[in-house]
Amino acid sequence: MTRTLAEALLLIFTTLSAGTVTFVATVLQPAMNDLDEAAFARFLPSLYRHAVRSVYAVGTSTVPFVAMIPYFIVYKVEHPWFVAGLACFTLASTASKIMNLPIYRRVAELKSDEVAKLREERRKLQGANHVRALISFVSVLLMAVQFAY
């Protein structure tokens, strides 16, 4: 496999993952904001449960990590823009684990009548989703720059 093909495949999966994250931040999050707090408290655990079982969601977020290992072994870090993009992808995923997962857990533990706490968690989730989408988008841009040179 050529380096260009390997980078193109990594870019495709990273773009698919970034697209999913952007969809969540720009379409699904506003829909969650329209829900009353009790409905949000029921919806978010269901969303999480379905997301972790989704072959698409898990695949597009996992394939780049798995593929990075042989990429770095074979091609090292000779393409700095591409490596920077992979680093941003890793940062976006790490941000998700640090920022989003605790929110999912807290919402699952809250009762539907804890309106103020649910409202605050929803606000935090919106911010976390936007940060994650922005970093994911930057990762795709950085990786794509490599193809311009």
Task: Tell me the role of every PLM-derived stretch.
Residues T90-I98:
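Mid-bilayer segments of alpha-helical transmembrane spans in multi-pass integral membrane proteins
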Residues T2-T15, P64-A67, K76-L91:
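Interfacial segments of alpha-helical transmembrane regions
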Residues M99-K111:
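A cytosolic-side transmembrane-helix exit/cap motif
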Residues A57-Y71, R132-L141:
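Core segments of transmembrane alpha-helices
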